[in-house]
Amino acid sequence: FGGMTDGYERYKKIMDNPPENLFFPGIVSPERMRELYAMADLFLLPSYNELFPMTILEAASCEAPIMLRDLDLYKVILDGNYRATSDVSEMREAILEYKNDSEALKDLKEKACEISKEYSEEHLLEIWLKFYREQAALGKK
């Protein structure tokens, strides 16, 4: 996979001996997952490549404010309901901003709720029902 595994050894050392404020829980139950997301002041996904990351939907459903790398994919599927950052320096600045501005963090949390609503089971059901009804109507013509 080339570039996707760059830095593995470096990060493996960190995982083997993490700082006190960082832990790697491994596979967790859905109940524990909700608890962990709810504990987060901010959900950060700095990934360079993604398809459709479920972690974002999980975090949004737990009302965790979301910060992501500025990828074209996110613009399309999340409709701006997150904080986009271009690099680690900008991520750091944004984290410090949110640390000192609870209103901005609250706004980001509300945006997470919008993501959650957009991808809720109820909303997706509405979209699929509309689609199938339209297809059925076309088939009757």
For each predicted feature, which ranges?
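C-terminal alpha-helical cap of glycosyltransferases
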Residues: E121-K141
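Aromatic "clamp/platform" in nucleotide-sugar-dependent glycosyltransferases that forms part
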Residues: Y48
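A short, well-ordered alpha-helix in the C-terminal region of glycosyltransferases
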Residues: A104-E118
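A short hydrophobic beta-strand element within the catalytic core of glycosyltransferases
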Residues: F43-L44
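Short alpha-helical donor nucleotide-sugar binding micro-motif in glycosyltransferases
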Residues: I27, E35-A40
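Nucleotide-activated donor-binding/catalytic signature segment of Leloir-type glycosyltransferases, i.e.
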Residues: Y11-V28
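Short hydrophobic beta-strand element within catalytic cores of glycosyltransferases
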Residues: P65-L68
